[in-house]
Curated annotation (Swiss-Prot):
Keywords: Chloroplast, mRNA processing, Plastid, RNA-binding, tRNA processing
A GO cellular-component term linked to this record: chloroplast
Gene behind the chain: matK
The protein, known as: Maturase K
GO molecular function: RNA binding
Protein species of origin: Umbellularia californica (California bay laurel)
Location(s) in or outside the cell: Plastid, Chloroplast
Organism classification: Eukaryota, Viridiplantae, Streptophyta, Embryophyta, Tracheophyta
GO BP terms, alphabetized: mRNA processing; RNA splicing; tRNA processing
Length: 507
C-alpha cells in the first residue's frame, strides 16, 4: 500500500490517476483475495488458463488482451444466444480481473477521503462503523421533527449508467474500457439466469466489486442533497467535506433546472430549513424535517425529477413515502420507530388561585417488529410460521456444547442488536423460541423427549441465553434493583454492533 500511495502522490499524477498499470501487479490480486503478499494466488490449473502459469503478471496481461480480442467478436447485441464472448473461460477471466480492479480503483478515493478527514480533524471511519450510532442520532433529533420521508434508492437499470457514473470519477480511459468489458462479460454470462443489466450480478461472486459499484451509484443519488444544501448559504459546509469532488455536475444539473423551474435560484428558499436531517443505510434512507408537509413534498418532487433526469430512468414516486412522526411509525434497520406524545398535568397554585398546566413531552419510541423476526426464524427453521419452536437440523459431528454455543451466539446477537427497544416483550418471545428450539434440537439428537431432556439437565439449562445481558446491565446500573426489572424499561444501545449475522450461517 505504501508503494501505491507513493506512486499516486507523485507530482505528475496528482491531478489524474493512471490506475491501469496496477492491474498487472500480482500483489493487487493478493490484496483482493486477502492472501499473503509473498504467495501467488493466480496459479490455476493449465486446463483453466490455457497457458503457462509461471508468471502471474504475464497471466493477467494475457487475460486482458484476450478480453479485448474476444469483445470484437460479439455478433449481435440483440440476440441473447449469440451475444457471447468467444472462449470457454471468460467468466473466470473477467471475475479475476474485476477483483483486482476493485482494489485498484479504491486507492485514490481512499487517499482523498483520508486526507480530507485529516485536514478537518474528523475521527477515522472505523470509529463510525456502528449502525447503532444512527439510533442515538434519531433519539436526539427526531423528537423535534414533524415529518419523515421513507426513501428507497432506485437501482440502475443499465450497466452503461454505472460506467458513465464512474467516468466522472476516473479519468483513466483504459481502466474505463476494461470496466465496461468486465461489466458486459458478467451481463452476458448471467443473462439467462438473472435480470439483465442489474447490479445484483456481482453481489455473490465478487462482493468487493459489487460494493464499490453500489457505493458509487448511491453517492450519485445522494449528491443532490449536497448541492442543494450548499447553495442557499453560499458556503462550503463542513458536514459534506468528506465527499469527493465531482466534475461536470453543473452541466448535468442544467437540464434538471429547466424541468423544475425556469429560475432555479427562486426555489432555493425551500431548502433553507436548518432542521432537515438525512440518514441512509444500504439502499434505504430517511429524510426528516421540522417544517411543514409542503417542504417535504417539494423535496420528494425534486428527488424524483433529479433521478429521472440524471439516470435516465423512471423513478416511481411511490418509492418515497411521507409520514407524520406522531401518527405513523417508519421501519428502519429492524425497528419500528416513531415519536410519541406523553402528556402530563401539573397543578400549580398562586395565592388563592390554582390552575392546571397540560404539557406534552415528545419521546422517541423504538419497537421490535415481531412478525418479521418470526419470519426470519421460520426461514432459518428455528420455528414455524406461527412462531412455534421446532428442532433445527444439525450436522451429526456437532457436539452438544457446539450446538449450545451456536444457539447462544444467535440469541446474544439478537438481544444486543434489539436492546434499544422501548418494549422488550417481543425480544423475550424471540429468546423463548430460540431456547425451546435448542432444547428440541438436543433432545432430537439424543432421541429423547423434550420433557425428559429438560428434567435431566435441570433448571440451569441454557442460562447463558439470559445471563449476559443482565451482567452487562449490572455494570451499567450498579444499584440494588434487579437488572431484569431494569432491562424491561431501560433502553441500551450496544454501539459495538456492526451487523446482525445471518441466522442460517450459524447452524
Amino acid at each position: 500500500m505504501e508503494e501505491l500511495q507513493g506512486y499516486l502522490e507523485m507530482d505528475g499524477f496528482r491531478q489524474q490517476y493512471f490506475l491501469y498499470p496496477f492491474l498487472f501487479q500480482e500483489y493487487i490480486y493478493a490484496l483482493a483475495h486477502g492472501h499473503a503478499l509473498n504467495g501467488s494466488i493466480l496459479y490455476e490449473p493449465v486446463e483453466n488458463l490455457d497457458h503457462d502459469n509461471k508468471s502471474s503478471s504475464l497471466i493477467v496481461k494475457r487475460l486482458i488482451t484476450r478480453m479485448h480480442q474476444q469483445n470484437r467478436l460479439i455478433i449481435s447485441v440483440n440476440d441473447s444466444n449469440q451475444n457471447r464472448f468467444v472462449g470457454h473461460n471468460n467468466h473466470f477471466d473477467s471475475q479475476m480481473i474485476s477483483e483486482g480492479f476493485a482494489v485498484v480503483v479504491e486507492i485514490p478515493f481512499s487517499l482523498r477521503l483520508v486526507s480530507s478527514l485529516e485536514e478537518k480533524e474528523i475521527a477515522k471511519s472505523h470509529n463510525l462503523r456502528s449502525i447503532h450510532s444512527i439510533f442515538p442520532f434519531f433519539e436526539d433529533k427526531l423528537s423535534h421533527l414533524n415529518h419523515v420521508s421513507d426513501i428507497l434508492i432506485p437501482h440502475p437499470i443499465h450497466l452503461e449508467i454505472l460506467v458513465q457514473t464512474l467516468h466522472s470519477w476516473i479519468q483513466d480511459t483504459p481502466s474505463l474500457h476494461l470496466l465496461r468489458f468486465s461489466l458486459y462479460e458478467y451481463w452476458n454470462s448471467n443473462s439467462l439466469i438473472t435480470p439483465k443489466n442489474s447490479i445484483s450480478l456481482f453481489s455473490k461472486e465478487n462482493q468487493r466489486f459489487f460494493l464499490f459499484l453500489s457505493n458509487s451509484h448511491v453517492y450519485e443519488c445522494e449528491f443532490i442533497f449536497i448541492f442543494l444544501r450548499k447553495q442557499p448559504f453560499h458556503l462550503r459546509s463542513k458536514s459534506f467535506g468528506s465527499f469527493l469532488e465531482r466534475t461536470h455536475f453543473y452541466a448535468k444539473i442544467e437540464y434538471l433546472v429547466v424541468v423544475l423551474c425556469n429560475d432555479f435560484q427562486k426555489t432555493l428558499w425551500l431548502f433553507k430549513d436548518p432542521f432537515m436531517h438525512y440518514v441512509r443505510y444500504q439502499g434505504k434512507s430517511i429524510l426528516a424535517s421540522r417544517g411543514a408537509r409542503l417542504l417535504i413534498k417539494k423535496w420528494k418532487s425534486h428527488l424524483v425529477n433529479f433521478w429521472q433526469c440524471h439516470f435516465d430512468l423512471w423513478s416511481q414516486p411511490a418509492r418515497i413515502h411521507i409520514k407524520q412522526l406522531y401518527n405513523h411509525p417508519f421501519y428502519f434497520l429492524g425497528y419500528l420507530s416513531s415519536v410519541r406524545l406523553n402528556s402530563s398535568v401539573i397543578r400549580s397554585q398562586m395565592l388563592e388561585n390554582s390552575f392546571r398546566i397540560d404539557t406534552a413531552i415528545k419521546k422517541f419510541e423504538t419497537v421490535v417488529p415481531i412478525i418479521p423476526l418470526i419470519g426470519s426464524l421460520a426461514k432459518a427453521k428455528f420455528c414455524n410460521v406461527s412462531g412455534h419452536p421446532i428442532s433445527k437440523p444439525f450436522r451429526a459431528d456437532l457436539s452438544d456444547s457446539e450446538i449450545l454455543n451456536r444457539f447462544g451466539r444467535i440469541c446474544r446477537n439478537l438481544s444486543h442488536y434489539h436492546s434499544g427497544s422501548s418494549k422488550k416483550q417481543s425480544l423475550y418471545r424471540i429468546k423463548y423460541i430460540l431456547r425451546l428450539s435448542c432444547a428440541r434440537t438436543l433432545s432430537r439428537k439424543h432421541k429423547s423427549t423434550i420433557r425428559a431432556f429438560l428434567k435431566r439437565l435441570g433448571s440451569e439449562f441454557l442460562e447463558e441465553f439470559f445471563t449476559e445481558e443482565e451482567q452487562a446491565l449490572s455494570l451499567i446500573f450498579p444499584t440494588t434493583s434487579s437488572p431484569s426489572h431494569r432491562s424491561h424499561r431501560e433502553r441500551i444501545w450496544y454501539l459495538d454492533i456492526i451487523r446482525i449475522n445471518d441466522l442460517v450461517s450459524h447452524l
